[in-house]
Amino acid sequence: MTILPFAVSHLETLVLQPAQAAWQGELCPDSLQALEATGEAWSLLVRQRIIGCGGVQEQGGGRGLAWALLAQDAGPAMLAATRVVRRYLQASPYRRIEAATACSFAPAARWAAMLGFSSEGRMRAYCQDGGDAERWAYIIPDRQES
């Protein structure tokens, strides 16, 4: 697995898992360009193919918002991806990193828990389709504000 700086073009070849497929046409080009410019986003390359993109968007006050888009066949690479993301979380400048997972997609919640996030509860009607989401947080209490 190779970790690359995120580029908007990486999303063009990424065939998203069905639970995330609705996002493909909803991603704002300006937002994607901003993610690319920040340097706080990466892509995972396996056998010369992008299998996932993700990162953390700064929210101010020492907070970040985690995001990830994964290929439908990313499963075999998830152990290695989990290790990479854990290392990032442990070294990140944020004291709090937030994430949301669709309640209808249990594997996302399992991955958040494996990464060390703690559930903060259900957010009603949060998802694009009107479905509920679970809010997660990764907290490092002694981390200085970024």
What are these model-predicted stretches?
Residues A22-A41:
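Active-site rim helix/loop that mediates acceptor-substrate recognition in acyltransferases
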Residues G39-Q57:
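Conserved beta-hairpin
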Residues G54-G62, M123:
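A conserved beta-strand-loop-helix scaffold within acyl/acetyltransferase catalytic domains
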Residues G61-D73:
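Conserved acetyl-CoA binding element of GNAT-fold acetyltransferases
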Residues S92-C103:
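Conserved GNAT acetyl-CoA-binding A-motif
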Residues A100, S118-A133:
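Conserved catalytic-core motifs of GNAT/GCN5-like acyltransferases
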